[in-house]
Amino acid sequence: MAVIAVIDYDMGNLHSACKGLENAGATPKITDSARDIEQADAIVLPGVGSFDPAVYHLRSRDLEAPLKDAIASGKPFLGICLGLQILFDASEEGSQPGLGIISGVVRRFRSEPGLTIPHMGWNQLEYTQANLPLWQELPFNPYVYFVHSYYVDPIDPSVRAATVTHGSQKVTAAIAKDNIMAVQFHPEKSSSNGLKILSNFVNQIRVKAIA
């Protein structure tokens, strides 16, 4: 079974993500060890909370360089929620620089009449990379579960893999570039659609291992 390093940096409950990966047929390993990251078949970076504490905790544990090295090596990577946002250069939420792996910034939803912030609950994805392996065998415009007040705004629009509309604002819900995949929603809370997304990620790891 594929061993997936699930990065522990004190930003949320990792066990629901691990359970989803186990159900998808992988062996998740919660870790903050550079050696584990290097030896794993793939990496999952979950996270809930605020941008500045997240990047602070990653850097205080000396995890920035191992993560960047693993991604640069081509290792499959899945970011979830805050684990998507900290891939970017900066956030309107804080002052700390992000990891800068994807060019762009994290923005807050604009206030508008009747709009609830945070965006919380079930909403539909619209694919912008319809043939992405992560979306295989999912229904058209599937419902997934969101909890966020901020969204990523990549400089290169081609990295967008899906969008979501909240009020009048259509924003990035997922990105994909080479071996990097990351989603704003919570697949581990998204019922059968979320489990399928995690299964598709695990299948990507198997395909890479065979290749």
From Swiss-Prot:
Q: Where in the numbering of this chain does the Glutamine amidotransferase type-1 domain appear?
A: 3-211
The catalytic site is made up of 81, 186, 188
Q: Which reaction is the catalytic activity of this chain?
A: 5-[(5-phospho-1-deoxy-D-ribulos-1-ylimino)methylamino]-1-(5-phospho-beta-D-ribosyl)imidazole-4-carboxamide + L-glutamine = D-erythro-1-(imidazol-4-yl)glycerol 3-phosphate + 5-amino-1-(5-phospho-beta-D-ribosyl)imidazole-4-carboxamide + L-glutamate + H(+); L-glutamine + H2O = L-glutamate + NH4(+)
Reported EC number(s) for this entry are 4.3.2.10, 3.5.1.2
Q: Which cysteines are joined by disulfide bonds?
A: none
Q: What GO terms fall under cellular component here?
A: cytoplasm
At the top level, the lineage of the source is Bacteria
What SUPFAM superfamilies does the database record attribute to this sequence? Class I glutamine amidotransferase-like
> From the Swiss-Prot or TrEMBL record, what is one GO molecular function term?
lyase activity
GO term, biological process aspect, one? L-histidine biosynthetic process
User: NCBIfam families from the xrefs?
Assistant: IMP_synth_hisH
Protein name (Swiss-Prot/TrEMBL): Imidazole glycerol phosphate synthase subunit HisH
What organism is recorded for this protein? Gloeothece citriformis (strain PCC 7424)
Show the taxonomic lineage. Bacteria, Bacillati, Cyanobacteriota, Cyanophyceae, Oscillatoriophycideae
